[in-house]
From Swiss-Prot:
GO molecular function terms listed in the Swiss-Prot or TrEMBL record: methyltransferase activity
The protein's name in its UniProt record: Putative S-adenosyl-L-methionine-dependent methyltransferase Mvan_1344
One Pfam family recorded for the sequence: LCM
Record's keyword annotation contains Transferase: yes
Coiled-coil features, chain-numbered ranges: none
Binding site for S-adenosyl-L-methionine: D130, D159, L160
Lineage summary: Bacteria, Bacillati, Actinomycetota, Actinomycetes, Mycobacteriales
EC category name: transferase
GO biological process: methylation
Similarity annotation: Belongs to the UPF0677 family.
PANTHER family in the record: S-ADENOSYL-L-METHIONINE-DEPENDENT METHYLTRANSFERASE YKTD-RELATED (PTHR43619), S-ADENOSYL-L-METHIONINE-DEPENDENT METHYLTRANSFERASES SUPERFAMILY PROTEIN (PTHR43619:SF2)
Amino acid sequence: MARTADDSWDPASSVGATATMVAAGRAAASADPDPLINDPYAEPLVRAVGLSFFTKMLDGELDLSQFADGSPERVQAMIDGMAVRTRFFDDCCGTSTTAGITQVVILASGLDARAYRLGWPAGTVVYELDQPAVIEFKTRTLAGLGAHPTATHRPVPIDLREDWPAALHAAGFDASRPTAWLAEGLLIYLPPEAQDQLFDRITALSAPGSTIATEYAPGIIDFDDEKARAMSAPMREMGLDIDMPSLVYAGTRSHVMDYLAGQGWEVTGVPRRELFTRYGRPLPPEAGDTDPLGEIVYVSAHRPQ
């Protein structure tokens, strides 16, 4: 189903299902014999969503031979990819709070459990913004698991296409204080103009000393949805009745690093393969034709004093 300007979702549908997919990846990465991350809530959250494709993935019941490259090496590279991505954003949180930032905003938080699993310094406030159905599901499920936030946790149930800055302020956000912003796995699901608006709003809300962690997928400019649809066909054949490529907004858009630099941020980009080296993981195959989004660049930015 094509995206619309006012579409909504829960963790089992549309864009929400991609959050469940990412959580399943975090669960697999956490179960690795030599884990880079530890997300004890990823697996129970995925199971609570109840999409059979992802529960079978957790149970090792998927027939990987149906995928174009379901070799053990390729599967491990995918698990490692989720591990290094998660660790990058975890480390950005740690670097920001070590520098004295006590206000963290996670945009489109999905099934992210950082407010519960990271060791936040005393006095840290973590705001999470996402669709109301996603926020309600995660908060209720984690409470049922007996999980407790490790920081002051302020969920903000709102669509990011609405006036989320006003909702953030209403939840207690203080724009006069530096903020650590996380926008993980979000940008490809925004139209190009909405991506610019997102960073305009972040900049307007960011005191000097604030930070941003996000990523940029260069392949989104000439994203081939038919190729992506063919690559994801086995997922549909195994029961995941969601057309993942239709959720993405392709086409020309601002380069995240250039756009943020133009807004006065000091920006650093790290290609995904460099993250593998940083965290001691074997280099994955070059993206080439195997990844319609190309080689993702992980971006961190700092607003100077």
